[in-house]
């Protein structure tokens, strides 16, 4: 059985593809060590209403503008939490309307992967991982089997296509990330977003 990719001397392997790209949100870039690495999967977890969706929508809009300037693929924002109209309204409020920011409302994994195939994004945002379900797996969205399957499929897409993926994740009442604990070990980075939903400041 021949390997899919031949082994090469390490000095001949370009490290450029593994360099972090700034998100345009300074504090998030600081936490991530300079930005998002192509092919990396980042989980942003926090309580409902803390501002996870707004933060990632801002990141998506800034990334879309940067991708357009670099003649790269668009940014695909998939919402399973809200309607496309609700997300568009929030984008207007934060000045996040950009022609390279594509929006899709999907809750089925196959349809989500079809959107990725059709659009060829340079960044994928999924809000949230607990709202997506695979028709091939028993159980409802957010269950252990579903979250594991959905996360696994999205991680595979990130690695195969070399695109960063940002996932929104909810936390339980005791502060733990909802879904199987394995989710935290599957992704490359886990960011905890905290704060009072009525306050102006948030902690990442």
Which residues fall in each region the model found?
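Short gly/ser/thr-rich secondary-structure transition/capping motifs
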Residues: 22-28, 103-107, 173
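Phosphate-binding/switch region of NTP-binding enzymes
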Residues: 148-204
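Conserved P-loop NTPase
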Residues: 1-10, 117-121, 130, 189, ...
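Residue-level signature of catalytic and energy-coupling elements of molecular machines
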Residues: 31, 44, 87, 127, ...
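Conserved inter-motif catalytic segment of the P-loop NTP-binding fold
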Residues: 39, 47-50, 54-156
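Short flexible coil/turn linkers enriched for glycine and charged/polar residues
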Residues: 38, 81, 196-200
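Detector for small/aliphatic-rich hydrophobic stretches
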Residues: 1-42, 54, 61-64, 70, ...
